[in-house]
């Protein structure tokens, strides 16, 4: 499968708890942190949930 790079571009402060947990599950804990994941449906669903906080590169 293809891989995607996910970068946190906005702060998690004042976000609902479920969105904070989603960022944790993606491995994003700090601003401007980049993680690489396989583009499977589970990861893409998590990215969709926090799309206003992250940017995605293929």
Swiss-Prot record:
Q: Give the CDD domains listed for this entry.
A: Ribosomal_L30
Q: Which domain of life is it from?
A: Bacteria
Q: Does the keyword Acyltransferase apply?
A: no
Q: What keywords appear on the UniProt entry?
A: Ribonucleoprotein, Ribosomal protein
Which InterPro entries does the record associate with it?
Answer: Ribo_uL30_ferredoxin-like_sf, Ribosomal_uL30_bac-type, Ribosomal_uL30_CS, Ribosomal_uL30_ferredoxin-like
Q: Does the keyword Nucleotidyltransferase apply?
A: no
> A single GO molecular function, which one?
structural constituent of ribosome
Q: Which GO terms describe its cellular component?
A: cytosolic large ribosomal subunit
State the oligomer form and interacting partners: Part of the 50S ribosomal subunit.
Q: What is this protein called?
A: Large ribosomal subunit protein uL30
Q: Which organism is it from?
A: Parabacteroides distasonis (strain ATCC 8503 / DSM 20701 / CIP 104284 / JCM 5825 / NCTC 11152)
Its encoding gene is what?
A: rpmD
């Amino acid at each position: 499968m293809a891989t995607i790079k996910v970068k946190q571009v906005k702060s998690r402060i004042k976000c609902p708890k479920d969105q904070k947990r989603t960022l944790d599950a993606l491995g994003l804990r700090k601003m401007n942190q980049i993680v690489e994941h396989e583009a499977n449906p589970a990861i893409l669903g998590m990215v969709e949930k926090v799309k206003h906080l992250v940017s995605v590169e293929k």
